Design a protein with these regions (language model features):
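Expand to "…catalyze enediolate/carbanion chemistry for C-C bond making/breaking, isomerization
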Residues: 1-285
Length: 285
């Protein structure tokens, strides 16, 4: 699945939802959590079912983010055909993931949906979540990817640190989460540090630099942006360049020639070619 770019938007704002599929992003997160005021939570739940096919036009995937403390009510409202993923924020234990899995399964059965069709995305946003991250990531087969925290407001508040600073105060946390994901064979969504001292969510240049840096680190999944201005940057940054694609085809061609010999590796034009380099090239393509 190609998931380079996304937009998170309040489901209670019709103009955002109606235009989401035109933004060019690979997925849209219909938000019930932070962007929806407490007094509109009940109303927001009534909008999800119709919003799913609306944002899915043109092949965009529909995700939703529910409220941690309102798991049962929110899950009942969002499990409908066409939804691809539920983002569960502030996940802290494996038991929470298993409880969410059971709820999703219940409604998939009741509504005649394919069992297991909806993924779970766990929000690793607290110190406790980091200590439990391996158990969280392995708690359900619905967890296909792990969002290795980039910090954010919740993690900053939990740790008591400043968020918009010129250094990476979350490097250890991201590393712990990424190692757990790699050990489990899960795809990883995170990014190397690129300073954002102003808190801007619409800096297209910074978004491009961060996406390119992430791809160079073997991270091919983009995040859910908050402003349409960063969508194109994420699409470009997470997409291999023409030169990258050409090089990958060349590497595979050399590897195919190597397969006709008894040698485990070869050197062509100063490049070392073996099965590991071939695997890297396949990943690019």
């Amino acid at each position: 699945k190609v998931r380079r770019s996304g937009l998170t938007m309040p489901v209670v704002t019709p103009r955002f939802v109606d235009n989401a599929w035109r933004r060019g992003c690979d997925f849209v997160v219909l938000d019930l959590e932070d962007s929806v005021p407490r007094n509109l939570k009940d109303h927001a739940r009534t909008l999800i079912k119709d919003a799913i096919p609306n944002v899915s036009k043109g092949g965009t995937e529909a995700f939703t983010r529910i409220n941690h403390e309102l798991m049962e009510a929110d899950t009942a409202a969002v499990v409908w055909p066409g939804l691809k993923r539920i983002k569960y924020p502030k996940t802290e234990t494996a038991d929470e993931v298993r409880a969410l899995d059971a709820l999703i399964t219940r409604y998939e059965k009741e509504r005649g949906m394919e069992l297991g069709s909806i993924e779970i995305d766990t929000g690793i946003e607290t110190a406790l979540a980091i200590t439990n991250v391996y158990d969280i990531a392995s708690a359900s087969p619905r967890v296909k990817e792990l969002s290795a925290t980039n910090g954010g407001y919740d993690m900053s508040r939990d740790l008591g640190v400043e968020m918009f600073v010129p250094y990476d105060q979350f490097v250890y946390l991201k590393g712990e989460a990424e190692l757990a994901a790699r050990a489990l064979g899960l795809a990883v969504r995170t990014a190397p540090f690129v300073a954002n001292t102003t808190g801007s969510v619409s800096d297209a240049d910074r978004a491009l630099r961060q996406a390119k840096a992430a791809r160079a680190c073997g991270i091919y999944l983009g995040g859910g942006g908050l402003n349409p201005a960063v969508v194109d940057s994420h699409n470009k940054g997470y997409t291999p360049s023409t030169d990258d694609v050409r090089d990958a085809h060349w590497v595979l061609a050399q590897f195919e020639r190597l397969q006709t010999t008894d040698e485990p590796w070869t050197e062509v034009e100063g490049r070392f070619i073996d099965r590991y380099e071939a695997e890297r090239a396949r990943g690019v393509l």
